[in-house]
Swiss-Prot record:
GO terms for molecular function: structural constituent of ribosome. GO terms for biological process: translation. NCBIfam families: rpmF_bact (TIGR01031). Keywords: Ribonucleoprotein, Ribosomal protein. InterPro entries: Ribosomal_bL32 (IPR002677), Ribosomal_bL32_bact (IPR044957), Ribosomal_zn-bd (IPR011332). The lineage of its organism: Bacteria, Pseudomonadati, Spirochaetota, Spirochaetia, Leptospirales. GO terms for cellular component: cytosolic large ribosomal subunit. The keyword Transport does not apply. Belongs to the bacterial ribosomal protein bL32 family. It comes from Leptospira interrogans serogroup Icterohaemorrhagiae serovar Lai (strain 56601). This is Large ribosomal subunit protein bL32. The keyword Ribonucleoprotein applies. SUPFAM superfamilies: Zn-binding ribosomal proteins.
Length: 66
C-alpha cells in the first residue's frame, strides 16, 4: 500500500484547503412579494412558484398565556 514519503507541513495542508470554503447562496427576489429566496424553489414567505401560489405560507400562532 502506498504511504507518503514525507510529512506535509501545516502550511501545505492549509494552502490546499483554501478552496474548500462554502460559497454564498445565490438569492433571487420573489416576483410576488419581493422577499429573497433560493432559485427554483417555493418562496418561504408567500408560497409562490412560477405561475401561482403552490403552498399556503405558515402562519405563526400566538402563544397562549396561562
Amino acid at each position: 500500500m502506498a504511504v507518503p514519503k514525507r510529512r506535509k507541513s501545516k502550511s501545505k495542508v492549509r494552502t490546499k484547503r483554501a478552496h474548500h470554503a462554502i460559497g454564498k447562496p445565490n438569492l433571487v427576489p420573489c416576483p410576488n412579494c419581493n422577499s429573497y429566496r433560493l432559485p427554483h424553489r417555493i418562496c418561504p414567505t408567500c408560497g409562490f412558484y412560477k405561475t401561482g401560489i403552490v403552498l399556503e405560507p405558515k402562519v405563526k400562532k400566538p402563544k397562549e398565556e396561562n
